[in-house]
UniProtKB/Swiss-Prot annotation:
The lineage of its organism: Bacteria, Pseudomonadati, Pseudomonadota, Gammaproteobacteria, Enterobacterales. Inhibited by chloro-3-hydroxyacetone and D,L-glyceraldehyde. It comes from the Bacteria. This is PEP-dependent dihydroxyacetone kinase, dihydroxyacetone-binding subunit DhaK. Changing residue 109 to A/N: Loss of kinase activity. The gene is dhaK.
Amino acid sequence: MKKLINDVQDVLDEQLAGLAKAHPSLTLHQDPVYVTRADAPVAGKVALLSGGGSGHEPMHCGYIGQGMLSGACPGEIFTSPTPDKIFECAMQVDGGEGVLLIIKNYTGDILNFETATELLHDSGVKVTTVVIDDDVAVKDSLYTAGRRGVANTVLIEKLVGAAAERGDSLDACAELGRKLNNQGHSIGIALGACTVPAAGKPSFTLADNEMEFGVGIHGEPGIDRRPFSSLDQTVDEMFDTLLVNGSYHRTLRFWDYQQGSWQEEQQTKQPLQSGDRVIALVNNLGATPLSELYGVYNRLTTRCQQAGLTIERNLIGAYCTSLDMTGFSITLLKVDDETLALWDAPVHTPALNWGK
């Protein structure tokens, strides 16, 4: 294994120290470790907080700033942050209007964020939750009960962050997050595995002519391993799966801060249909050249046009990675005029930055 690290035990500490030094708009906290906006708490606005295992950079710490997250809790590589990190971060960013926890659907994340939610409620913080489960590839996986939360998380953090920035209430922000989760669809493929520093070897092996179809962002198995032929064929198979697997029913939990208890809600993922308008994210899983990602986007635009989908906005690049995995994911999020206005609203973070 050759990686630009000193000691595997210091990877998280050193990368966070570098992030904070590179971006004075962020504050790195210690004991426990978490990151916030330097101006947190922001009075009069809902605070957004997310987190998860490291290795997916720039998610989540790269999305802290005006118009997006108030703070983020990074765990060790592919390891959920502990409840005390989440609790302390939320206490730091709470500006009095409540805290919304955006949680990717992985067993460890769910358990730890739910524990922190109850601790926050007991401490008098108005808090609620949104669970993201946009991966259409598999229902259950190595890390999840239910579908995985992947790159649509980035889009939701941007859009809900814009709503919080303009002064929307905690309930409105949470409702928007759940709506966007039901309108977003993602799928990924891998041509090569990632290497976790502590393991020192690739997490799986593929033959030269194989790809992992429906891979997760921790290298979890997907739908199957199948022959890799060409860019167009790969995008076509992914696009068809997004459409075919795009509708499903499931039960998701959220915290009702008024009743002080968990509530279960039946939700339906909305399939993409002709006439829909979308934001398209072509996401580098770590080691895929940008030139290839633009090739992917070229084919994706053709398939969207054929299916009657209009791409209103796009992101192409590394936004939700899996260390050094060779591969990419596609996310399509159904939008309307209001959603696009939130997308176009100013955002100033290390990884997304536009507007005044």
